[in-house]
Amino acid sequence: VSVLHKDEIGRDTRDIERPISGFEPVLLNEDTLVIPTPGHTSGSSCLLYRDKFFFTGDHIAWSATRGHIYAFRSVSWYDWSELVRSAELLRAYDFEWILPGHGRRCHFERERMRAEMEKGLRWMQSAA
């Protein structure tokens, strides 16, 4: 199933199967949740699969040089403060993998991932 937020739909993507809108998570099936995460763009979204694998697109990734999860401020084309708010809302979810479209992926057990997310959020908030 092709899924895209309505804010991202253009001429070449108007025929997608499942357009979504708004900012509430959308359950695609019993295993997959689409979570709107505006910031990089107004229609940025992430996919949480089986409460384990978090496909983050251009939202967040692991930084080996910084030693924490981070966001791409230099390509936050929509709104950095929205990106930070979106990242803060991710506290509601448990996952073990961050699988970005760009940047490094990372894997931690759930408890450590929560701690790493908090560390990354502190950095994002201070970079605001």
Segments predicted by a language model, with ranges:
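Metallo-beta-lactamase
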Residues: R11-D12, L33-P38, S42-A127
